[in-house]
UniProtKB/Swiss-Prot annotation:
This is Peptidyl-prolyl cis-trans isomerase. PPIases accelerate the folding of proteins. It catalyzes the cis-trans isomerization of proline imidic peptide bonds in oligopeptides. PANTHER family: PEPTIDYL-PROLYL CIS-TRANS ISOMERASE-RELATED, PEPTIDYLPROLYL ISOMERASE DOMAIN AND WD REPEAT-CONTAINING PROTEIN 1. InterPro entries: Cyclophilin-like_dom_sf (IPR029000), Cyclophilin-type_PPIase (IPR024936), Cyclophilin-type_PPIase_CS (IPR020892), Cyclophilin-type_PPIase_dom (IPR002130), Cyclophilin_A-like (IPR044666). Transmembrane segments: none annotated. It catalyses: [protein]-peptidylproline (omega=180) = [protein]-peptidylproline (omega=0). Belongs to the cyclophilin-type PPIase family. One of its GO terms (biological process) is protein folding. SUPFAM superfamilies: Cyclophilin-like. It comes from Helicobacter pylori (strain J99 / ATCC 700824). Residues 16-162 form the PPIase cyclophilin-type domain. Keywords: Isomerase, Rotamase. GO terms for molecular function: peptidyl-prolyl cis-trans isomerase activity.
Amino acid sequence: MKPIKTYDIKEEELAKTAYATIKTNKGNITLELFYKDAPQAVSNFVTLAKEGFYNGLNFHRVIAGFVAQGGCPYGTGTGGPEHRIKCEVAHNPNKHQRGSISMAHAGRDTGGSQFFLCFVDLPHLDGEHTVFGKITSAESLSVLDKIKQGDIIESVVFSPSL
């Protein structure tokens, strides 16, 4: 099994990346990242994105009324980085609501690079997957609604504020 990676990024540093914009071939999806509630998931997402990991990957799993999932380097849902991260669900108050971004995994503490965006509220996933952010605008939700399987993540950029 891949080793668990733990990030030691200070909250002040994470605050500089409090907002993410996932640039797709359908438009931009802007999210607020919950770095106080899910610091490891946010650190992992930010680190991978800044390394260019997500650039050019696709949304390999899109199920209407459920989720749009991306972040697999193979485009199949079977890949990830050479590490995994722990789930952060115990003290995370965030729920799987329409527009939430959450870590995908194949079992507790197996998340790596794959994430999903919720098309609708999915309360049955609460406590199972780490919610680490949420879409900030109706415009971004509209872009999410246009995502289809195979659509491309062009890049991910960050800012401290909107």
